[in-house]
């Protein structure tokens, strides 16, 4: 649906996203994007808000456009208080020029995108560049993830942090933990 909508009307995402009344949330990160996005949507709907959401995790440009196009009524307009949109980190380059989010939720940043992007630093650079294009966007960041927290602190955007207040488990594992050390201070 998104690919066809973009062919017919290339500005569709820009136009429909402007009709969201209260705010647009984007959810990015390596793990938990779909779950976080759907929980956020459910919380807003439980408060009586009307929400556009890409529930199935179609998180690249065509999927985001499809969520908005399918959320439009027969009159071609969105009737939504909020939008909760899961976005693939690299796809922010295609989505942010068309849609200006009010909030970005960052779950974490790990090496899973290695097959697509080569290095975690490439993913971080893409996100940092796109965050700079929306200086008013409030970042809602997993403070327990050193890479996400560093990126938020370095961005200059307003931000709030969430996480676990104390360590639940301190057992060491053999898994690669590239986000284990802070890029700013080197601490765990």
Residue ranges and their predicted role:
Residues 1-163, 167, 171-181:
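Phosphate-binding loop of NTP-binding sites
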Residues 183-187:
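Short, cysteine/histidine-rich loop/knuckle motifs that typically chelate Zn2+
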């Amino acid at each position: 649906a998104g690919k066809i909508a973009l062919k017919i009307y290339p500005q569709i995402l820009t136009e429909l996203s402007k009709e969201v009344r209260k705010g647009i949330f984007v959810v990015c990160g390596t793990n938990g994007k779909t779950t976080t996005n759907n929980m956020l949507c459910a919380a807003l709907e439980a408060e009586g808000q009307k929400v556009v959401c890409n529930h199935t995790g179609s998180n690249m440009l065509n999927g985001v456009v499809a969520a908005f196009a399918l959320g439009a009524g027969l009159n071609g307009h969105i009737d939504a208080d909020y939008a909760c949109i899961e976005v693939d980190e690299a796809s922010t380059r295609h989505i942010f020029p068309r849609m200006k989010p009010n909030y970005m939720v960052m779950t974490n940043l790990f090496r899973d995108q290695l097959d697509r992007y080569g290095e975690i630093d490439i993913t971080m650079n893409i996100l940092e560049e796109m965050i700079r294009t929306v200086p008013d966007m409030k970042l809602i960041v997993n403070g327990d993830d050193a890479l996400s927290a560093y990126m938020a602190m370095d961005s200059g955007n307003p931000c709030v942090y969430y996480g676990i207040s104390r360590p639940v488990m301190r057992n060491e594992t053999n898994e690669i933990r590239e986000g284990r050390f802070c890029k700013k201070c080197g601490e765990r």
